[in-house]
């Protein structure tokens, strides 16, 4: 609806109703760019020495924050404190990734450019970052003799996560440009994603880092097996077309809301009961839940 003297008197120069003020795009874009920056920091810290933990610890020390951070954590090991700081920054970026879409919708500022910007940020924070972190972990396990000799040469396999993220995000960007009729989940409001979402890779490898950081001595020698899953089955799941559930359509189907609620409760219980390893197992349950939901769900 056109309002004001100019709009009523000179319709030709009035702005169309669909024009969104430019400032409305910036809150969501800022969250997306924070996610991009957080992912870049994680990449830098992981690649600085391929010795996870020391680079973020030295970064904190250069700012004069390390002692205070270790005191907050109650941690006396610099490397562990550095690992936890890396995870905090990384997960803060992922939180921004969760919020940017909701903020864009709330501001009425959805658009193809925002979707593409989100994909570029995810390529760094959920593709390059887990690939670098995965390589650093695999090299650590190789150096300490945790990995069997037969697979010790596979330390570059985590790069498949980057390739899968690039493929998946390119597909998402194409769908965003083509319009709602081609969006992920093919119109089925029970599913939010086609294939595992790229941020799942960040959560998976962050969970492995967290578990490894909490392991005393060689208490988690078997983690390399989960690492191998994270650079083989995980990338395959990302590029697949298997529908996956999410929270975007919460409230539109009470039965599915109940199923997701039960799963979230179970995930929380396992994470609390088993600690960091429980968190990794909870993450593994996500694609399994999506597969079961897709197999036994009935289309409306």
Spell out what each predicted region is.
Residues 1-22, 181-300:
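C-terminal membrane-associated helical module and adjoining short loops/tails
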Residues 1-98, 263, 267, 271, ...:
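Topogenic membrane-insertion module of multi-pass membrane proteins
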Residues 27-36, 121-126, 192-202, 256-259:
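Select subsegments of transmembrane alpha-helices in polytopic membrane proteins
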Residues 28-33, 77-84, 88, 106-172:
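Multi-pass membrane catalytic core of lipid/isoprenoid biosynthesis enzymes
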Residues 31-34, 86-90, 157-164, 201, ...:
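Hydrophobic alpha-helical transmembrane segments of polytopic
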Residues 37, 95, 99-103, 120, ...:
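Active-site His/Glu-centered metal-binding helix of metallohydrolases
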Residues 41-88, 131-156, 208-226:
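Helix-coil boundary and interhelical linker segments in multi-pass alpha-helical membrane proteins
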Residues 152-198:
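Hydrophobic, well-structured mid-protein blocks that either form specific transmembrane helices
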């Amino acid at each position: 609806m056109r309002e004001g003297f100019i709009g009523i008197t000179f319709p030709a120069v009035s702005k169309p109703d669909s024009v969104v003020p430019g400032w409305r795009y910036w809150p969501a874009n800022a969250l997306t760019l924070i996610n991009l920056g957080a992912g870049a920091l994680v990449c830098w810290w992981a690649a600085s020495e391929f010795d996870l933990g020391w680079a973020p610890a030295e970064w904190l020390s250069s700012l004069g924050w390390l002692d205070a951070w270790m005191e907050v954590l109650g941690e006396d090991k610099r490397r562990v404190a550095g690992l936890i700081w890396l995870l905090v920054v990384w997960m803060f970026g992922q939180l921004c990734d969760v919020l940017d879409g909701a903020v864009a919708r709330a501001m009425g500022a959805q658009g193809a450019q925002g979707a593409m910007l989100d994909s570029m940020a995810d390529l760094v924070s959920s593709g390059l970052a887990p690939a670098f972190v995965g390589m650093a972990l695999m090299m650590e396990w190789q150096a300490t003799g945790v990995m069997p000799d037969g697979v010790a040469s596979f330390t570059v396999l985590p790069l498949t996560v980057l390739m899968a993220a690039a493929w998946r995000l390119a597909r998402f960007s194409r769908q965003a440009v083509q319009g709602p009729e081609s969006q992920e989940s093919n119109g089925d409001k029970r599913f939010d994603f086609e294939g595992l979402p790229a941020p799942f890779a960040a959560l998976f490898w962050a969970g492995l880092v967290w578990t490894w950081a909490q392991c005393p001595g060689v208490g988690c020698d078997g983690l390399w097996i989960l690492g191998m899953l994270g650079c083989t089955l995980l990338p395959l799941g990302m590029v697949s077309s298997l529908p996956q559930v999410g929270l975007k359509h919460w409230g539109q189907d009470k039965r599915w809301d109940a199923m997701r609620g039960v799963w979230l409760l179970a995930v929380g219980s396992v994470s609390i009961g088993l600690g960091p390893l429980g968190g990794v197992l909870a993450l593994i349950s996500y694609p399994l839940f999506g597969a079961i939901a897709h197999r036994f769900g009935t289309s409306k």
